[in-house]
Amino acid sequence: MTTDHRWTTPITADLLRGAVDLETTTRGLLPHRLTARARRQIPDDQLAMAEAQPSGVRLVFRTRATTIELDTLPTKRVYQGFPPPADGVYDLLIDGRLAAQASVSGGNVRTVTDMFTQTSVLAEGPAGTARFADLPAGEKDVEIWLPHTEITELIALRTDAPVEQSPPSRRRTWLHHGSSISHGSNAGHPSAIWPALAAAAGGVELVNLGFGGSALLDPFTARAMRDIPADLISVKIGINIVNSDAMRLRAFTPAVHGFLDTIREGHPSTPLLVVSAILCPVQEDTPGPLAPDLDGGRLRFTATGDPAERSAGRLTLTIIRDELAKIVQQRAADDPNLHYLDGRDLYGESDYAEFPLPDAVHPDGAGHRRIAENFARLAFGDGGPFATKTR
């Protein structure tokens, strides 16, 4: 891109979708997926890192440009003793279809030194540029989906033709909360995480509050969801409660009620779908906590709890699914817009046989596609809780 034919467009909230809050930094803007108030109440580095990773966040604009450059400062996560992951992927969509991809090398590196405590150290690095060249000529709608597993500070947007703000979307907004699977763990690129694929199939705008390791019924997350505008809401509950061994059944049931009560304060009649965990054999009937298993040179997870303690209130996915079904049935008596979906209908025994979980917990790219297909059919399809109402 020559300097004689270059436009630099300020990156503002008008160009971003999927972000809950934007933090002004010395370089530019840092998208967040929790409000500033909620972030002040985060108790650990795991969620602080996860909510700042822009899963589902994208720049959206119209342009005739054939070359687009986005300067960013990524913060990448690596685990001590393991090879660093590949650089995060930026997906560029034209008129809703994936047209190009890029990555940014360098950046900050946060090294997790203890997988149990998530203790980490940060090494600072340089900013870089995601460059998309040889794009089709002519006016087009462009989306740049940011890497879902890299904190991404936005610095500058350059093009070889002017950029116009896209008109406000007329599509419904879907607000979703879940665990690392909803965050996009093990998906190959950001527009291929299951919530993004399901949103595309359902024709809705996604706000993704999938937080790796952190779907723990935190009240500050419920308050954030209460205050975020949405036409459709889903909450996926179970796997993090079990794999962190965060609570017992006595605490779990009122925590779910409280979480749903808080959401309903801001969205009293919005379709609200409670989704339980997908099939995860290591946690179906064995309590947590989950522990990393490094035997064989690759990361897998194993449950370390004692199944005999289920009678004392230790939680498993089977117990949580049963309890969630009861909670929703009870509440639906006076909340007709509350619905329940068993996560095994998204990914169950037959899906596991076809697309096993590589690390025993997280689906791969094919698994994400299967979950998205089933969610789109069951939630957005005819008769589903998110189906478009016809008059």
Locate each region found by the language model.
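Loop/turn elements at helix/coil->beta-strand transitions in domains of secreted/extracellular proteins
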Residues: G203-E205, P229-L232, H267-L272, D335-L338
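A general structural detector for well-ordered alpha-helical segments in enzyme core domains, enriched
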Residues: W194, F252-F259, I320-I327
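Serine-esterase "nucleophile elbow" of acetyl-processing enzymes
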Residues: L135, V142-P229
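N-terminal secretory targeting modules
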Residues: M1-T173, L294, F380-R391
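Catalytic His-Asp segment of secreted/periplasmic serine-dependent ester chemistry enzymes
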Residues: P281-R391
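Acidic/histidine-rich helix-loop elements
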Residues: N208-A215, N243, A360-P363
